[in-house]
Amino acid sequence: MGKNNDWLNFEHLVKDKQIEALQPPSMYKVILNNDDYTPMEFVIDVLQKFFSYDIERATQLMLNVHYQGKAICGVFTAEVAETKVAHVNQYARENEHPLLCTLEKA
C-alpha cells in the first residue's frame, strides 16, 4: 500500500518545536557600579545578602567595584537578574546610598 497520507506527517513540525523548546534561556550579568559615597562595608553587605558570597569573595568583588569601577555579581536568567537588580537598588535607597546595580546581556 502506498503512502497516500504523506501530507499528514507532522513529524518535522514536532521536531522543530522540540528544538525551540530546548533552547537555553537568555542570560544576564548583574553588575554593581562604583560611586564615591557608598561605604565599602555596605557593598560587602549587599554582596553577602543578595548574592550569598562569603566575606572573602564579597571583599574581592567590592575591591573590583572600587578599583575597576564595576564588578559582575553573577549571571542569571532575565527574571532572576531583574529581581536582584530591583532588590539591591531598593535596599541601597532604603539605606540612603547611591549604589547602582544594573544588568546587561551576557
UniProtKB/Swiss-Prot annotation:
SUPFAM superfamilies reported in the protein's UniProt record = ClpS-like (SSF54736)
Alphabetically, which GO biological process terms does the record hold? protein catabolic process; proteolysis
Question: Pfam families, alphabetically?
Answer: ClpS
Q: Which NCBIfam families match?
A: PRK00033.1-3, PRK00033.1-5
Describe the function of this protein.
Involved in the modulation of the specificity of the ClpAP-mediated ATP-dependent protein degradation.
Task: Fill in the subunit field for this protein.
Answer: Binds to the N-terminal domain of the chaperone ClpA.
* Similarity-based family: Belongs to the ClpS family.
From the Swiss-Prot or TrEMBL record, give the protein name: ATP-dependent Clp protease adapter protein ClpS
Which organism is this entry from? Yersinia pestis
